Every structure is written in structure tokens, then in C-alpha cells.
Amino acid sequence: MRELVHMQAGQCGNQIGSKFWETISQEHGIDEMGSYHGDSDLQLERINVYYNEGQGGKYVPRALLIDLEPGTMDSVRSGPLGKLFRPDNFIFGQSGAGNNWAKGHYTEGAELIEEVLDVVRKECEACDCLQGFQLCHSLGGGTGSGMGTLLIAKIREEYPDRIMTSFSVVPSPKVSDTVVEPYNATLSVHQLVESTDETFCIDNEALYDICFRTLKLPNPNYSDLNHLVSLTMSGVTTSLRFPGQLNSDLRKLAVNMVPFPRLHFFVPGFAPLASRTSQSYQSCTILELTRQMFDAKNMMAACDPSHGRYLTVAAMYRGRVSMKEVEDRILETQTRNSTYFVEWIPNNVKTAVCDIPPIDFKVAGTFIGNTTAIQELFTRVSDQFSAMFRRRAFLHFFTSEGMDEMEFSEAESNMNDLISEYQQYQEVGIDDDYGEEEAAPEE
């Protein structure tokens, strides 16, 4: 089986990750003790992708829970799934990273990293045929961003040919926890550009908007936001976990989605989003589902795809849907909005269909877009970064951990390069010889 090793780092990563395990345990019929109570063989057919089978038919998530302080771990342990995870896979420090990227990446995190890598090796050795790794973390804090990127870099060295995916929560301007978020996020993106194959960008602001506007929740809390994230994560990983007519694994997704190795930051979306009360009153046709999937209001990151163009898109449908109708609707969407798709990548929309819908849905769709509009998200962080870095504000927190200002400048220019690469591919037409004229002067 193509196994995945799941890692979650920091407070945000552990909360989102735990919610994800709740969601997929429900889908696979695994209760909180790890016993199977499902009603369909399909639930067990590819269960090895995420679970190890322990003694007495108990299923144990192949998950590592990592944090630099014990608090979040304790709440996961006492939560609904506390007994499900393997006790040895809780790896935590005592000091905390204090929202400081340098502590997570260079000092505190570096002390814990060997312990984490030992558990990673143990999990990988038990695999039949390891497909890759996925990491849940946020980019605004200290542990998820600093230690998370350190972990990715280390695993990349040791398993260079395995796919590396991250679900990264990008800090948003309206929902901010700490002043140094722009620093932490920029330093993290600097690492992610080089070290991951696919990064799904999730944004608290977009999640709040969905809760307010679409789900009509008067005061959404973090568990509502995490529920949305877990729906999306479950959708993205559907085709790995269930047999369907079109199965794609993470590597196929990467091949279809990443036209240039640096541009691997995706905007995920989910449909149908309806408030819990009105859900049962709506029947969702494929037409409606497709329309919703491409709607900016359903995107989990705060950028508007209509401000840019899609390089590639993957659409995953779940439920009893007709393949032909799915293909027709997607084609229709593409022809009607052809200006929003770059014309130099023909058939750049990939569809996958899985027969098993998520819990509580008849049909559902997950959307993954590689759009040039995501530069809005990076530009926002970059502007905040520059404003603070120009004044060298808060820099002593980082330099006292042994970081150099040089590293900040590098991260800043790498982020700006990324933004201009997206911009460049947004503007290029089918007949522009972009590569040739740039390559000429080097001779």
C-alpha cells in the first residue's frame, strides 16, 4: 500500500491535525479506541494509507504529534481521540517557542529534532511502500513554522525521492495572534519554496468569512474553523484513502498541478458549504457543485482567483456522480471562463471521482487551484514584513537566538521573487517567447 506519514507541529497544527483524524476516523468507521465498526469493505480496502494495524485488529494512526510545550499535547490526550494515537508518537519539549521562529528552527526545536526523526524513521521502516509525508502547521507561530520547516528540511535530506506535502495556515491581517507573524511567515515560506512538493495554503480570515457569510454562524470559534479545514483535508486525501474510478496519489497530483517547481502553493476549496440547518433542504446538482467550487467565497485562502489566472486546477468529486457529467461541467466552466485559465497549458483541469461521500453529505467536491492570484496572500505578508524589517523592529528576539539579519534579507527577496514569478506567468500569453529573450544575455 502507498503509506503516508502524517506529522503535526505546534498548537495550530495539532488542533487541525486532531480534527482531521476525527474526520477520517469517522469516514473509515474507526472508533476512538481504534476498533473498526464500519459497514463497508471499501472503508478497509486502503486503510493502510493512514493507519497501522496493531494487535487485536486495532487501527493506529500513522501520526506524529510534535510541540515544544506540553500544553497542546495534554489537551489532545484528554480529547476524544486521546486513546487512538500511539503514546510514543507524542514528542514534546518543555520550554515552548514563544512565537519565535528562531527558537523553533535553531535552538529549542533543534534540540528536539533528533527525537522526532527517530520516530519518523521507525514509522517509515514499518511501511510497505512509503508514498510521502504530510505536515500540518501554521506559519505565524514559533513551533509550527520554525520547527515544522526544520523537520521538512531534515526529512527531505533523508528521503529525497518521497513526496512532501504541507497544510500551512497562513497568517491573515484581520485575525492576528502575534506581532511577529510576518517575520515567522516569511522565514517559513523561504523554506517551503525549496523543501515541499505541494503546499495547501489555508487562511484564518477566509475561514472566518465562510463561517459568517455562508454558514451564518454569529460567532465562529476555532473548532468551527478547524472543522472546515478538516473537510478540505479529508477531500484532498480522498483519492488516496478510497478506491474510485480515477485515483490520484500525491505524486500524480504534483505532476498535474505544478508547472514550475517553485510554484507549488495551492488554494483549496470545498463545496457544498451550507449552514448545518439548511443542509437537508438543498439538493446539490453537479452543476451547482461545480459553480460553488470555482466560487471565490468557497476558497480557504483569502485571495480572489478572478484577480489572477489559473495555471492548473484539480477537482475531486465525492459521491455517486456520473463521470460524464463531471467532465462536461468542468469543460463548460473552462470554456465559459477561458480568460481565467492560462492558455499555454492545455487541459489544465484534472478531475478525480470517488464513490464514497463524506459523512453527512450525498455529494461533495474539493477544489485545488494553482492560481497566480495567490500572490495577493504573499504580497500582504511581504508588505507587513518590510514595514517592520525596515525599522529592525523586534529583530533582537531573533538575533539573540543566533540568527543573522542576512537571513531575513534572503527570505524577503525569495518571497518577492516568488511574487514576481506568479506575476510573470499571469501576464505571459501563448505567443510570447518568454524564455528565449531572457536567456540570451547570459552567453
Swiss-Prot record:
Query: Which BP terms from GO are recorded?
Result: microtubule-based process
- Required cofactor(s): Mg(2+)
The family database entries (SUPFAM superfamilies) matched by this protein are listed as: Tubulin C-terminal domain-like (SSF55307), Tubulin nucleotide-binding domain-like (SSF52490)
Q: Which residues bind Mg(2+)?
A: 69
Q: Which GO terms describe its molecular function?
A: GTP binding; GTPase activity; metal ion binding; structural constituent of cytoskeleton
Recorded GO cellular component terms are: cytoplasm; microtubule
Residues annotated as binding GTP:
11, 69, 138, 142-144, 204, 226
Pfam family for this entry, one:
Tubulin
Q: Write the record's keywords in alphabetical order, separated by commas.
A: Cytoplasm, Cytoskeleton, GTP-binding, Magnesium, Metal-binding, Microtubule, Nucleotide-binding
Q: Which PROSITE patterns match?
A: TUBULIN (PS00227), TUBULIN_B_AUTOREG (PS00228)
Is Mitochondrion a UniProt keyword of this protein? no
Q: Which domain of life is it from?
A: Eukaryota
> What compartments host this protein?
Cytoplasm, Cytoskeleton
Reported function: Tubulin is the major constituent of microtubules, a cylinder consisting of laterally associated linear protofilaments composed of alpha- and beta-tubulin heterodimers. Microtubules grow by the addition of GTP-tubulin dimers to the microtubule end, where a stabilizing cap forms. Below the cap, tubulin dimers are in GDP-bound state, owing to GTPase activity of alpha-tubulin.
Its subunit composition reads: Dimer of alpha and beta chains. A typical microtubule is a hollow water-filled tube with an outer diameter of 25 nm and an inner diameter of 15 nM. Alpha-beta heterodimers associate head-to-tail to form protofilaments running lengthwise along the microtubule wall with the beta-tubulin subunit facing the microtubule plus end conferring a structural polarity. Microtubules usually have 13 protofilaments but different protofilament numbers can be found in some organisms and specialized cells.
Give the protein family: Belongs to the tubulin family.
**Protein name, per record:** Tubulin beta-3 chain
